[in-house]
Amino acid sequence: MARKLFTPITIKDMTLKNRIVMSPMCMYSSHEKDGKLTPFHMAHYISRAIGQVGLIIVEASAVNPQGRITDQDLGIWSDEHIEGFAKLTEQVKEQGSKIGIQLAHAGRKAELEGDIFAPSAIAFDEQSATPVEMSAEKVKETVQEFKQAAARAKEAGFDVIEIHAAHGYLIHEFLSPLSNHRTDEYGGSPENRYRFLREIIDEVKQVWDGPLFVRVSASDYTDKGLDIADHIGFAKWMKEQGVDLIDCSSGALVHADINVFPGYQVSFAEKIREQADMATGAVGMITDGSMAEEILQNGRADLIFIGRELLRDPFFARTAAKQLNTEIPAPVQYERGW
């Protein structure tokens, strides 16, 4: 039987050499606080391309300075960010990998000086600052910031854009009734709470014609929060809008007890794939080749997003291939040690 983990897949006009995706993970290493890449970021991402990851998604990159989680996050709110990202995309592609970027706004979870913004003036928790409720004008302005960031991503040479609509950040805050108490067109019904994301997708697609992913938190793990049924509905709308894949994570909107175990989020990817007829990515405690292969062989997801395991092992692709008794090509420079 062919090992599906190492079978190419084409999404829109992009072909990945395998189904392994480096999940976006914040490194909090833009130490000049200007949102720019550092030598660390270059080494971090290029090393995973050398390690034969099919698709590398750069960590959450803020569309606005006040949309960072911390002041050491990456940003793509300025044309000054394009040059650094262009150098990174060129180097990653030289190693045969594709590269994406996650466009993000932290919303009420921003830990920054000055005002932070959210759909409603509801703090994340008792230790967090209370955000300013966004005016309708501010909402429209933020939608345009996502569009402008997407245009910069295209200029920088990225292959994929992922919109971050998960983990309790701004878009997730609009989607969930726990954090969105608005009474205007952006609050109330599921259609209204989805409107912010709908407008972002529509605007991004005006300047971006490549593969478009959206990361979601498929469960809030708490009463009256979002659950998988809600996200199946959202996924159907995303498909209508031309989103190519949903990256299925969960949680982090509110503090909640989560039963974490290997592959604990895979069922979300499976259900969205089946019930919304949508390509999905599985993520969360997927740590070996056999687990990844099972998910793919059983049609539970289309891509495997690997996070912490790629921090521990930049050569996860090689490790997984050995676990599956298959061979993958080595970088020419590494052939004698592969």
Swiss-Prot record:
What is the induction note for this entry? By toxic xenobiotic compounds (2,4,6-trinitrotoluene and nitroglycerin), and in response to oxidative stress (hydrogen peroxide and paraquat).
Q: What class of enzyme is it?
A: oxidoreductase
Tell me the GO BP annotations in alphabetical order: response to toxic substance
Q: Cite a single GO MF annotation.
A: NADP binding
Q: Which NCBIfam families match?
A: PRK13523.1
Q: What else is known?
A: Forms a charge transfer complex with a variety of phenolic compounds.
The entry's protein name is NADPH dehydrogenase
This protein's species is Bacillus subtilis (strain 168)
Gene (UniProt): namA
